[in-house]
A protein has these predicted regions:
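Non-heme Fe(II)-dependent double-stranded beta-helix
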Residues: 1-81
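Secondary-structure boundary elements
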Residues: 36-50, 86-90, 100-107
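Extracellular structured ligand-interaction cores
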Residues: 55, 91-97, 107, 145-147, ...
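Short, structured patches in soluble enzyme cores that scaffold and shape functional sites
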Residues: 62, 71-73, 94, 98-102, ...
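A short secondary-structure junction signal
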Residues: 67-72, 78-82, 106-115, 121-125, ...
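Short, P/G- and charge-enriched loop/turn segments at secondary-structure junctions
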Residues: 79-86, 143-144
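Double-stranded beta-helix
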Residues: 90-93, 103-163
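Non-heme Fe(II)/2-oxoglutarate
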Residues: 126, 152-157, 161-222
Length: 222
């Protein structure tokens, strides 16, 4: 799907696409960071499992495409908030973005506004550069923004309350990335897609707890 503009094509729940994408669920390069930043160990947040992936996708974006700025702490969205208390992180959504191809100048790299996850004031240029349906918007010209360049195989980790978007791709070819979003076990799926039985049967016990921590639904009188 897409968001109705020029953000490229998303292939949702990409962990269904085979073993390479299954390995990303608990990849050793970042799984311990996710456990640390989502937090919640020995609390209700771990009642169903250590983490939950509510959405994961591959994104393909061509020339002239971009995604406008979005998120940011001033929006106050509980789904993706940032919190640090008593020496521990409690973040509702933490993203890992993996570059499948090199992303350099002109390739439409991810753009972030550093420290915006801690801000209580909206960026003064936010409304001009935010995502807009049926209209191209990008974030590379925002004051204080930082475009992130990646080599193929690099992974970028950030809390979703960080204000972020992308630059417009001006080079030929396609920008190809994969994104996995992690949060506490009580979360639920963003879109109406559920993991297949085939996938769940292939995963390790730890992976299944991350992909589908929810218990079997108990229906009254059945």
């Amino acid at each position: 799907h897409n968001y109705g503009g020029k953000e490229g094509l998303n292939l949702q729940q990409i962990y269904e696409a085979g073993e390479p994408f299954e390995k990303f669920i608990d990849h050793p390069s970042w799984i311990n960071h996710m456990l640390e930043f989502v937090g919640g160990k020995d609390t209700f947040d771990h009642q169903h499992g250590p983490l939950f992936i509510d959405e994961n996708f591959a994104n393909v974006r061509g020339p002239g495409e971009a995604i406008g700025i979005h998120s940011g702490n001033p929006e106050g969205i509980q789904r993706n908030h940032y919190r640090y208390q008593d020496g521990k992180f409690h973040c509702s959504q933490v993203n890992i973005l993996i570059a499948l191809k090199k992303i350099g100048p002109g390739d439409g790299g991810t753009v972030v506004i550093p420290s915006s996850h801690k801000s209580n004031i909206q960026h003064p240029e936010y409304k001009h550069n935010k995502m807009k349906k049926n209209r191209l918007s990008s974030a590379e010209k925002m004051t204080g923004s930082l475009e992130v360049f990646l080599d193929a195989g690099d992974a970028l980790l950030f809390v979703d309350s960080l204000c972020h978007g992308s630059a417009k791709r001006i080079n030929k070819g396609e920008r190809r990335i994969v994104v996995y979003r992690y949060g506490p076990s009580w979360g639920f799926f963003r879109h109406p897609y559920r993991p297949s039985t085939r996938l769940l049967n292939k995963l390790t016990k730890f992976q299944r707890k991350i992909v589908m921590p929810h218990e079997k639904i108990l229906t009254p009188d059945r």
